[in-house]
């Protein structure tokens, strides 16, 4: 079974994100500011700055509370990103006059409400792939044609799993209450890091030299240092040590684990991810509603026209369950982890209710242009979908 939807099309190879200008992300807003209200909607262009860091700099420059700023989606630090931020009770003229390193204010206008997470249609991507193989443009066009017709596999992919690619393993250990395993994975694998001091700190921990590991970990590794501090105090207190992790980080680990199981289910369903079956939970692309497929004759044409798509599980204690073959697949995947849906019913603000996620998403406005030995790609995806899913199918460099 291939990991690629477009397995019959040769990959282009190449390199992405060689410079910030090689990767442009631009939000497609769900609505435009009305021009009236108490929230200033500012469109920022950020160069090599993540969303949360931009919020910090913006709040400091304007003398407002960071928590009062609103945003529709999270953007990472790699590349150039254009996104809207809402700021309460600040005039557009004041925002437009700001001079913040790495941030340019492109426009500003007032609106009646604070911008909330999810208040966007999607994102447009303009990406340069450098040093591609011969015939790359034709192969990229062929891969994009398949994805335009059948959909883009809605994977999370490796960027979901942290710098060492193992945050989902921490989440799995949490759910099984295997706290030593969770701590071991959080401290990390020396083979997965390139920084010398970081590697030495991990190696010291693995030798059982916890105090030395603590001394070696740089100060900005706050989570790791707090874990190790507690282990120095009580060497066998792994649950106590792990409880020092903030709930926000614990939810991130649990979410990464959910994502890894979704990706696993998608991989097993890839050959038919654009077709619905009786027992599937289908997703309506128009409004995000989900329903159980019972009448295949009625629903199959809707999947063919991309009105609906089958879904996969973001496992949780109240998640809507599939029936039939898809339901059996999902139960097998969860049973292999020695977990049930009730396992996600955690206390302490960590309860994971779960949801359904479409196995595919539509791609819009896809264009390819050859520029010497580079490819220029331009396409749009709905919110919550990742450009890396498209790039993986085109480049096949995984």
UniProtKB/Swiss-Prot annotation:
Q: Which reaction does it catalyse?
A: uridine(13) in tRNA = pseudouridine(13) in tRNA
The question of whether tRNA processing is a record keyword is answered with yes
Which molecular function GO terms apply here? RNA binding; tRNA pseudouridine(13) synthase activity
Signal sequence region: none
Residues annotated as domain TRUD: 151-361
Its Gene Ontology cellular component terms are: cytosol
Q: Which UniProt keywords apply?
A: Isomerase, tRNA processing
Q: Does the keyword Isomerase apply?
A: yes
EC number(s) of the enzyme?
Answer: 5.4.99.27
Which InterPro entries does this chain map to?
Answer: PsdUridine_synth_cat_dom_sf, PsdUridine_synth_TruD, PsdUridine_synth_TruD_CS, PsdUridine_synth_TruD_insert, TruD_catalytic, TruD_pseudoU_synthase
Task: Kindly list the biological process annotations in GO that this record carries.
Answer: tRNA pseudouridine synthesis
Quote the catalytic residue positions.
76
For this protein, the parts annotated as crossing the membrane are: none
- Which domain of life does the protein's organism represent? Bacteria
Name the protein family. Answer: Belongs to the pseudouridine synthase TruD family.
Describe the task this protein carries out. Answer: Responsible for synthesis of pseudouridine from uracil-13 in transfer RNAs.
Query: What is the protein's given name?
Result: tRNA pseudouridine synthase D
State the organism named in the record. Geobacter sp. (strain M21)
